[in-house]
A protein has these predicted regions:
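An N-terminal alpha-helical hairpin/helix-loop-helix interaction module that forms a charged
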Residues: 1-110, 126-228
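Contiguous, well-ordered alpha-helical segments that form the cores/surfaces of helical PPI scaffolds
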Residues: 117-124, 138
Length: 228
């Protein structure tokens, strides 16, 4: 991995970090509210998911939220059962994700993206998992010359993204510009790991347009050089 390039992107992020704290705090508050009410054993799954999706409307892609609501509406008991298995932390993550996708696809006859599964994981355990956006991940992998090459959207892509995000989280957790905010939020009751992982997800979202701008600039100047 190109750590120099990662350091550059982190520097860009840190230069605007203070202006993003209010938005990050909104994310932390929203997820804390969701966790305080989480219960898959209630009579009806749909109202629960509708509440979660309404609260997360500004945090994630609307199409993924619609997928969650639609699944809960059409197959409440099936989804409840599958979610209990997805959240069984005694089973390796890759097996849980693929099993959940197979089970859901068997009753819907429709493709379930890994990004939607990541959202289910994130809603339940934001201190352990991240929102997974394949578009952002592919761009970041290219920019950092990451050791794993992505071909399509597979379980390998998801697991590789989580590994990269964990590596970034370790670096951010040691950064003197960001750790005071993490410690301050932990001191008033927020889960420290959750705060850190939300920052990592925010970083990935923040750097995506920077990466795309650089790629477009490089492509333009490469074409001009070839045309000479």
């Amino acid at each position: 991995m190109d750590y120099d390039r990662l350091e550059y992107l982190l520097a860009r992020y840190k230069s605007e970090f203070s202006s993003r704290i209010e938005y990050l705090a909104y994310k932390w508050d929203t997820l804390c509210a969701i966790r305080s009410r989480w219960n898959l054993e209630i009579d009806t799954l749909l109202p629960l998911m509708q509440i979660y999706c309404e609260e997360c409307g500004k945090l994630v892609e609307l199409r993924h939220l619609r997928s969650i609501i639609e699944l809960s509406e059409r197959f409440p008991e099936g989804v409840r059962c599958f979610l209990n298995s997805l959240y069984d932390e005694t089973i390796p993550l890759n097996r849980r994700v693929e099993s959940f996708r197979r089970e859901v696809e068997s009753i819907t006859r429709e493709h379930l993206p890994h990004s939607v599964v990541s959202l289910y994981l994130w809603l339940r355990y934001p201190e352990r998992y991240y929102i997974y956006n394949p578009m952002y991940v592919r761009a970041l992998f290219r920019e950092l010359n990451y050791k794993v090459k992505l071909y399509g959207v597979t379980i390998t892509s998801l697991m590789s993204a989580y590994t990269l995000y964990d590596n970034i989280a370790e670096i951010i957790a040691e950064d003197s510009n960001i750790t005071p905010v993490i410690d301050r939020m932990a001191a008033i009751g927020y889960n420290k790991a959750m705060v850190l992982r939300i920052i990592v997800t925010d970083f990935v979202q923040f750097v995506y347009p920077i990466i795309k701008e650089f790629e477009e600039w490089s492509s333009k100047h490469r074409d001009q050089y070839i045309a000479r």
